[in-house]
């Protein structure tokens, strides 16, 4: 013990020197060192029993089924990129996998020298104004309420919340402030900071200049140069219809202020001296003469395009100036196009306006007046009014091209009509054709009204004999269809017959002597309507004497019989089957109800109250 205490320092120095000597020796003799670390599972052979396999098979399996890890082995050390092996697959239990945690030393942002950083105040959290706890609100506070404390805390909270809200959300931006903030940025001028950011120097053009040559002038800055208009029009009160119409119908035009065009060196103005034009390197195009500032300004000064902001809701398909420049003849034709609504009149107008077309002559003789079918039994007798139909009042100013001889309604044989058509169709005007059409419709309507008055007596009831008297109404439809067929027959004869047939004289007699009264009724009406029908169709110069051919009589008679058979409307007697007449005499049981309940109404509470008052 005495020796150890006496030589303690020497023994310690000897051991220290010995260890130091050993370390120096190991460092000098690197080839004699060996790596004694335990092997890590960086490469695992996926084989159940690899010991029993041969060496070749083990080598193949190791090459094909080996999981290579991230451990890199060196001479003196190994490097694992993923860290040390995980102990029980838990990084918390493995040394070296702990994530270091550092304490926060600074609570404020560090500022540079001579600068002050303004820290925005935090928005206060909602808490209980009574006890100050953030876990619940004042309505859930278990402590007794202190009104003074609640009022004070609420006031402090609202003040703090208002300051934070004013700084964050209730800040207004004005155009002047924006201009001051971005006033240092000017279009077309590249600052030194922007050159550093783009990686260009003052002796070279920026890359976007070459791209602008392909895309053109920036549309955003072109919009800035656009001049706004109020859209208000001022009229001086003078009767200048042409100027007013042109000013009202013309769309708004966009004008530009050429003084606001921006200079871009290398794009719309010449490149400064000493700066090369490297458009080939950037795959662009050289400067275009059309993109020069003076050329573009001249184009914008003469540019007149409709603005997208124009709110002209009333648009006309054609300006009124076009109508004023039309000749008078064109205006008359346009009016005729709108007024004409008949196929016959349209065909006549087209023939007169385009060119002269040959019209074949009419067949000899007037249109045949066929005998209508006999009326069924039970038809009431004819009234004297049907024998003398009144003629419609016709104006005298439009001259009629044809003259019709009057017929004698008292005879059974109809007198043939003598038609003198000496007027060409080109001489007829639109007004004359319209007047003739109006006369035809008036005659047809009067004939139908006359037939309806004669067929249905005034005192005939609708019940009982309505079935037997109904066919007389249907006769009017047959007569109207026969007249329409006659009109079609006349038009067909115009285009089909081109030869003049010798004139013959025949008298039209009734084939059935029992229907003399019916002929007396139909002949005056048909003569009137057919006479007007002859006036509607203009024909070339020809003469038609009283007479007709047997062939024409057969054709018209067959047409009328087919029109009668092809009537799609059934007889009115079929509609009355199973229909009981409704007469007011059957409603006697429902009358007198109010008289029976009037006594009950007198005793109602409302009437009793009225009597008391």
Swiss-Prot record:
Biased composition (Polar residues): 304-321, 345-358, 404-414, 462-473, 494-519
Subcellular location as annotated: Nucleus, Nucleoplasm
InterPro entries: NEXT_complex_subunit_ZCCHC8, PSP_pro-rich, Znf_CCHC, Znf_CCHC_sf
Ranges annotated as biased composition (Low complexity): 384-394
UniProt record, GO biological process: mRNA 3'-end processing; RNA processing
Annotated GO MF terms: RNA binding; zinc ion binding
Swiss-Prot/TrEMBL keywords: Coiled coil, Metal-binding, Nucleus, Zinc, Zinc-finger
Protein name in the entry: Zinc finger CCHC domain-containing protein 8
Species this chain originates from: Gallus gallus
Lineage summary: Eukaryota, Metazoa, Chordata, Craniata, Vertebrata
Gene: ZCCHC8
């Amino acid at each position: 013990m005495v020796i150890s205490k006496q030589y303690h320092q020497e023994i310690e120095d000897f051991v220290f020197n010995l260890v130091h000597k050993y370390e120096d020796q190991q460092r000098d003799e690197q080839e004699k060192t060996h790596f004694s670390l335990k092997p890590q599972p960086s490469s695992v052979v996926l084989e159940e029993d690899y010991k029993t396999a041969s060496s070749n098979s083990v080598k193949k399996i190791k090459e094909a089924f080996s999981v290579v890890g991230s451990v890199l082995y060196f001479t003196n050390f190994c490097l694992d990129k993923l860290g040390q092996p995980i102990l029980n697959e838990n990084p918390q239990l493995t040394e070296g996998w702990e994530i270091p945690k550092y304490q926060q030393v600074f609570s404020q942002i560090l500022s540079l020298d001579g600068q002050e950083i303004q820290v925005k105040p935090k928005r206060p959290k909602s808490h209980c104004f009574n006890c100050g706890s953030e876990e619940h609100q004042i309505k859930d506070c278990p402590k007794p309420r202190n009104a003074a404390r609640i009022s004070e805390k609420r006031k402090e909270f609202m003040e703090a919340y208002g300051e934070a809200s004013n700084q964050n959300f209730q800040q207004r931006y004005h155009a002047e402030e924006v201009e001051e903030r971005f006033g240092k940025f000017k279009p077309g001028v590249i600052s030194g900071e922007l050159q550093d950011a783009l990686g260009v120097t003052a002796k070279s053009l920026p890359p976007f200049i070459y791209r602008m040559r392909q895309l053109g002038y920036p549309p955003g800055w072109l919009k800035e140069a656009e001049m706004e208009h109020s859209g208000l029009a001022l009229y001086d009160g003078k009767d200048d219809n042409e100027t007013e119409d042109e000013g009202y119908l013309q769309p708004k035009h966009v004008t530009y202020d050429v003084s606001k065009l921006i200079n871009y060196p290398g794009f719309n103005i010449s490149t400064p001296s000493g700066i090369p034009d490297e458009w080939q390197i950037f795959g662009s195009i050289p400067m275009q003469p059309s993109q020069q500032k003076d050329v573009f300004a001249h184009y914008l000064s003469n540019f007149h395009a409709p603005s997208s902001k124009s709110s002209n809701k009333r648009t006309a398909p054609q300006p009124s100036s076009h109508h004023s420049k039309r000749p008078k003849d064109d205006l008359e034709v346009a009016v005729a196009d709108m007024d004409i609504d008949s196929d016959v009149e349209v065909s006549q107008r087209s023939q007169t306006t385009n060119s002269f077309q040959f019209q074949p002559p009419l067949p000899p003789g007037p249109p045949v007046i066929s005998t209508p079918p006999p009326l069924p039994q039970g038809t009431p007798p004819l009234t004297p009014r049907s024998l003398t139909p009144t003629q419609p009042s016709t104006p005298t100013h439009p001259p009629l091209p044809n003259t019709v001889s009057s017929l004698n309604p008292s005879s059974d044989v109809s007198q043939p009509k003598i038609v003198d058509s000496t007027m060409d169709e080109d001489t007829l005007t639109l007004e004359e054709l319209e007047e003739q059409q109006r006369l035809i419709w008036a005659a047809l309507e009067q004939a139908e009204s006359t037939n309806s008055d004669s067929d249905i007596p005034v005192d005939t009831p609708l019940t009982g004999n309505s079935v037997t008297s109904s066919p007389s109404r249907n006769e009017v439809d047959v007569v109207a269809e026969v007249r329409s067929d006659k009109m079609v027959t006349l038009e067909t004869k115009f285009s089909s017959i081109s030869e003049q047939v010798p004139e013959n004289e025949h008298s039209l007699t009734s084939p059935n002597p029992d229907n003399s009264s019916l002929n007396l009724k139909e002949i005056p009406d048909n003569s009137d309507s057919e006479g007007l029908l002859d006036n509607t169709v203009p024909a070339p110069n020809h003469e038609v004497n009283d007479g007709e051919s047997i062939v024409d009589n057969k054709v018209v008679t067959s047409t009328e019989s087919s029109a009668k058979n092809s009537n799609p409307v059934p007889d009115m007697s079929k509609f009355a089957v199973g229909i009981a007449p409704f007469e007011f005499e059957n409603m006697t049981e429902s009358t007198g109800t109010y008289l029976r309940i009037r006594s009950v109404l007198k005793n109602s509470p409302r009437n009793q109250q009225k009597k008391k008052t």
